[in-house]
C-alpha cells in the first residue's frame, strides 16, 4: 500500500472529509480493520490567507513546497491538497 501525504488545512473541514473518504475506501477494498497509510500536515489557514491577501503567492507556494518536501521525506509516495 502506498503512503498518502495530505497537505491539509486549506480548510480543516475538507481535510477531515478527505481523511474519512480515504480510510473508508481502503476499508472497502481491503476489508477488516484496514485503514489508509497517511501523513498529514495541517496548515493554520490564517497564515496562508494572509500571504494570499498580501499577494505573496511565491511565499505561499514556497511554504507549500517545503511542507510537501517534508511529507515526501517522511515517506509519502503521493501528495494531495485538502
Predicted regions and their residues:
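N-terminal glycine-rich anion-binding loop in soluble enzyme alpha/beta folds
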Residues: 1-63
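N-terminal glycine-rich phosphate/adenylate-binding segment common to multiple enzyme folds
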Residues: 59-82
Amino acid at each position: 500500500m502506498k503512503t498518502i501525504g495530505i497537505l491539509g488545512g486549506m480548510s480543516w473541514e475538507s481535510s477531515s472529509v478527505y481523511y474519512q473518504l480515504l480510510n473508508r475506501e481502503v476499508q472497502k477494498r481491503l476489508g477488516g480493520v484496514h485503514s489508509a497509510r497517511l501523513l498529514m500536515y495541517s496548515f493554520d489557514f490564517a497564515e496562508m490567507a494572509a500571504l494570499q491577501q498580501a499577494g505573496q503567492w511565491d511565499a505561499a507556494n514556497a511554504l507549500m513546497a517545503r511542507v510537501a518536501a517534508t511529507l515526501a521525506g517522511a515517506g509519502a509516495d503521493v501528495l494531495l491538497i485538502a
